Every structure is written in structure tokens, then in C-alpha cells.
């Protein structure tokens, strides 16, 4: 059972829901006229894969990474949203309604190292690549077929 006493961190929460609700549906979504579903067990595995990637990046950068999310809420978005803090990083969900200049200003203030983005926002990403030098890596959420294969 998940309680306040046994769930102190996001990591604890992700691990416990994966164990306690392993075979229950976490999310259903439609893509190309097909309905897909992911269970809590799969979500936990994918989120822990993002956490493992984040741990490698923490070592590479020499500090806990600051990762921004630019996109609509979806399965991959949710794995990054909780996966990065599971490894001690910081997740910054960006407001998709902000203009490019404000995004740059906010990302600079937040010292963003990595941007995870939805392919629908590629024009903003191109602008950020040209105008936001603090971001060292750009990862398209849809380019990763299986979240457990996040690029090195």
C-alpha cells in the first residue's frame, strides 16, 4: 500500500506504483486510429530508464541536470517528467504558449542542460538551437521508439 510514511520521494512513488499496480492500465492513447495502452509496470520500467540516462548525464555534466520539457502531455512526456527527478535532476515543464524569446529567457534563468521536446514544436527548437547556448542536448520525445533506449 502506498502511504505517506513509505513514500517520501518521487523515486519511491514511481517504484511503488510499478509494484502495486503493475498489471493495471496507467494510460490509454490513440495514435493513427489505433488505441494503445501502457501499464504501471511498463511505465515504471520506462521511467527508471530515463532515470538511468539522467544519472549518466549528471556524471557527464558534473552536476544534477536541469531538463526542460517542451510539448503536450503524453506518455513519453510523463516518463521524463518523473524520470529526471528520480535520479536527482530537475524537470522544468515549459509553457508551450510562450513566445521564443521568453522561452530562451526562462531556459537561461533555469540553467537548462537538456531539452526534451515534442516534434510538433520543431520550429521553436530550431530557434532555441540558434539562441539558447545553455542547452547542450536536444532529444525529440517521439524519436525514441522505446523509452528504455534513450540516447547516450
Where are these regions (language model features)?
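Adenylate-forming
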Residues: 17, 27, 39, 43-50, ...
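AMP-binding/adenylate-forming domain of the ANL superfamily
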Residues: 2-28, 45, 50
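AMP-dependent adenylate-forming
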Residues: 13-38, 61, 145-148
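Short beta-strand segments
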Residues: 28, 69-70, 139-140
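Structural core segment of the AMP-binding/adenylate-forming
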Residues: 86-152
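Alpha-helix N-cap/helix-start and coil->helix boundary motif
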Residues: 44, 74-75, 100, 122
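Aromatic/hydrophobic pocket-lining residues that form π-stacking "cages" and hydrophobic walls in ligand
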Residues: 14, 80, 125
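Conserved AMP-binding/adenylate-forming
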Residues: 36-37, 53-98
